[in-house]
C-alpha cells in the first residue's frame, strides 16, 4: 500500500508554491474547500474550482506559472526522475561493491550460488540459471553459471584464476561481464551476466522470432559485435571462438559477446583442433582462419576472419557455413582454392563487401576491428521511405503502405540488373522487390540503442493503448523531421538527385539566374586597389558575403550569395559591383555551352594620366591551374581547359562608350548606389576613348567560367575601372532593340562593304567620335518630322542620281558604230524619215490598193518585224492607216522625236498623235498601249527590242506586218525589181496573243466610246514610189559600207 506523505511535507510544498505566486491568502480555502494536501494535488484542480474560491484569471495564470516551475514534467515525470536517480545511486553502490569484491575477491563462495534450472549444454559443460546472493546486501541477483568439468581444465588452478581476474576487469556495454569464479573439487563455475533471451543463434532459429530480426536490426547487431571486439582488441585479448552461438541477446536492440578468452585459458590448443576432424564433435573449423587451421596461430586478425563468418551466419538466419562439407573440404576450399561464402539473400551489398575484406587470405591485408567500426556507418544499409501505397500481385514484390521504411539490400538484383526494381526489406522482416520511383530518401538512420536493460521478451503489447498512441505520435514527428519537405513559397524544385545516384532536372542552372534580375560580375583588374574584407563575413577567407542594403534590383536584405572559390581572386583581385545585367543573359558563373576560337589581341584606348589602372590579368589568373571547389552545388567543376582560358588577358576586347553613358563614382558613405550616371560633365579620370564609327563590335562570348562576387559591404572601396565602365555600357548597348531606327542606321550603307564589320577592327585613338545620345529605356520610338523630311530628301536625291546614271548609260548604248548587226538595213525601213509629199499619183494609188489586198490575205499570219538596231531611233514611227471606206487622204510623215515621242498618222487633216513615254527611274516602267479597234483585226505582235520595254498595239490589216522572209513583190517601176535585201539572219520572233474585247469595239483611244461609230476610218494612203526606192538605196549604201 502506498505511503501517504506527512502533513509537514504537504503543508510545506503547498505553502511554498502559494508564497512564490503571491497567493498565500488562498491557502486556507484550498485546503478546506478543495481538500488539497500538497502542491502535487493541483494537477487535479480545474479552472472552475479555482473560480469557486474567488481566484481571478490573472491569479490563476501566476499559479500555473509557479506550478510549472516546481513540476516541469508533471508529477509523474517528477516521480520517474526520482526513481531514476535512486536507481542510478543503487547502480553506483552496487558497482562500487562489486569493484571492491572484484579487487579483493575474484573467487565467489559456493554457498552464495543457488542453481535454479539448466539452460543448455555447451562444448565445455552445462549452463545454468542461478541466483547469487551478494555479500553487500540481502538481494539475490540472477546470473548465468557455466559449469566446466575438471577433466577439461588442463591448466593449473593458479593460471586459470589469473585469466579469470583479467576477464573480470573487462567493462564494456557489448561484452558480457564476468563476475567471478567458483572453485570446487569436482567442477569450476563461471558466474556472468544472464541473458534471458539466449544466444543469437537460438533466436535466429526460432521461426516465431524471425520477424523480430529484420535487416536493419541485424545491421545494428553487426556494429555492436564489432564494437565489442574492438574493445577486446584494445585490451589485447583474443576470443578464439567468435560465432553466433557465443553472442548473447539481452534485448531486441542489444547483444553482447560472451566466452572470450576461454580457449586459451582452458588450454584446448592442439587436442581441440585434432578433435574437430572426428565425426562426433561440432567442428568450429568453418569459423577459423587458414593460419589457425594450419599453424594453430590465433591473433586478432584471426578473430576478424571469425567475425566475418559470424555476420554471414547472422544474415543467413542461422545457416551453417560451408554446410554439408567436411573439415578437409573446407580447408581445401578456403586455403587452396580461396573460395568465399556466397552473399546471403538478406545481406546488403555494402556489408558483403566488408565481409570479403575480412576473408582476405593474407593476414596483414585484413582490416582491424577499429577500422571496421570507423567505416561501418558508411556500409550501413540505407533506408528509403515509401511515398505511395503498393500492392503488387507478384509474389516476390513487397506490399507496403505510404510512409513505410524499406531497407535497400540490392540496387541491381539478378532479376532486374538494370535497376528498374530494387531488392529490399520491410521493418517486419519481409524481403522482396520494389520500385525506387515509389520511394524517397530517408535522412538519418536509427542509431543503435543500448540501454543495458534486460527484457523478458520481444513483444511490447503489454503497453496500454493510450501510451502506444502517444508513442506513435512522437515517432511520427521524429520521422517528419528526417524527411525533405516539399518546396514552400517561391522555392522551385529545379533538380533531383535520387537515392541511386541518378539525377534529373536543371543541374547546371545557377541559382543566381533564378533571381528577378541577376547582378553582373565585375572583376577589378587593377593591381593598386585591393578590397578590404567585408565585415559581414565571419572569416576573412570566406567568399560568401551578405548584402548590407536593399539592392536596386529588389534583392532582399541579408541575402546570401554563393560564390566560387577562386583562390587569391576572392580577396585581392575582385571588386564588388552593382551593375545591372540583361534579364535574359546567361548567369556569369555558368560556363558557355560552346568554345569560341581565341581572337588575336587588340589594342584598348588609353585613358588619361590622372587615373592609370594597369591591366594585369595574366598574372592574377596564373594561379588557376589547380582544380577548384565550388560553394554552389549546381555549378559545374572547373576543367583544365577552362582554367587555361582564364589566363588570357582581356585586353583584346575593344569596347566603345557613348558620352551620355559614362559613369562617375561617389563615396560609399554619401550614397548607397555605387554608380551614378552623369550626362553632363565627365571626369577626366573616367573618360575613355570611344570608337569613331557609330556601329560597335559585338562582344565575343567568354571562353571559360567567370568568377564573380555579387555582394559587398560599404567599407569596400570602388575605384574607377576601365573594364567596369566598358562592360556596363556594352551591356546597355546590347539591350537596345534593332527596331530602334535612326538616320544613321537607315542611310548608313554601302555596296562595297558588308553590313557587319569584322571584329578585328582597331580603335583609332586619335578620333573621338561620339554617337548621338540614345535612351536605354526607350527601345522603340517614332521618328521626328525633321528626320522624316531628311530621309525623303535623301531618297529623292538618290533617285535623281540614279536616273542621271541610267540616262548616260542609254546614251552610250545608242551611239553609232559601237554595235553592228546585219538586221540594220531591214530595221532602217521603219525609222527612215521620208519627206512629206503634196499629192499621190494614180500609179501609186493602184500600188497601194494592191498592197492592201495582199495585207488582207495575210492578216491571219502574225509575224513580228525584225528587231531594231541599237543605232536606230529608240521608239520608231508607226504608220497607222484608217480602216474606214472613206476616200483616202494623204499621209503626213511625222517628225522623228529622240527617244521619247511616238508619232502616228491619224487622219487626212495631217493630225499627229504624240505619245510620250516618261521613264523616271529603273524601278518604274510605264507601258502605254494605243489601240485603234477594228472588227476583223485580232492584234499584232510587239516589237522585240532588248533596249526598250515591249508594248502591244493592235493595228489594221496589212499595216506594220513585215515578214522576216524576202519582201513580197509589189507593182513598182523597173528599177526596183532587181533590188534584193542582203542575206541576213532571220530575226527572233515571239508571238504575243492579243485578246480583243468585242464589247469595246466602239472605243477610240483619243475620242472615247462611240467615237469610232460617228467618225469613219480614213482611206488607206497610196504609197509613193520613192519610199520603195529609198529601201533599195539604203540596202545599197549598207553594202558599200560593209565592203
Curated annotation (Swiss-Prot):
Binding site for ATP: 119-127, 146
Job description of the protein: Probable tyrosine protein kinase which plays a role in vulva development, probably by acting as a negative regulator of the let-23/EGFR and let-60/ras pathway. Involved in the negative regulation of germline development.
Coiled coil residues, start to end: 785-812
Residues annotated as the enzyme's active site: 241 (proton acceptor)
CRIB domain sequence ranges: 484-498
Record domain Protein kinase: where: 113-379
UniProt keyword list: ATP-binding, Coiled coil, Kinase, Magnesium, Metal-binding, Nucleotide-binding, Serine/threonine-protein kinase, SH3 domain, Transferase, Tyrosine-protein kinase
SS bonds (residue pairs): none
Keyword Kinase: yes
Signal sequence coordinates: none
GO CC terms: plasma membrane
Protein name (database record): Ack-related non-receptor tyrosine kinase
InterPro entries: ACK/TNK-like_SAM, CRIB_dom, Kinase-like_dom_sf, Non-receptor_tyrosine_kinases, Prot_kinase_dom, Protein_kinase_ATP_BS, Ser-Thr/Tyr_kinase_cat_dom, SH3-like_dom_sf
Organism placement in taxonomy: Eukaryota, Metazoa, Ecdysozoa, Nematoda, Chromadorea
Biased composition (Polar residues): 610-624, 825-842
Gene inactivation effect: RNAi-mediated knockdown in a gap-1 mutant background causes a hyperinduction of the vulva in 60 percent of animals. In addition, suppresses the slow germline development of clk-1 mutants.
Residue span of region Disordered: 443-481, 514-644, 790-842, 859-898, 932-993
Catalysis: reaction(s): L-tyrosyl-[protein] + ATP = O-phospho-L-tyrosyl-[protein] + ADP + H(+); L-seryl-[protein] + ATP = O-phospho-L-seryl-[protein] + ADP + H(+); L-threonyl-[protein] + ATP = O-phospho-L-threonyl-[protein] + ADP + H(+)
Domain (SH3): residue spans on this chain: 379-444
Origin: domain of life: Eukaryota
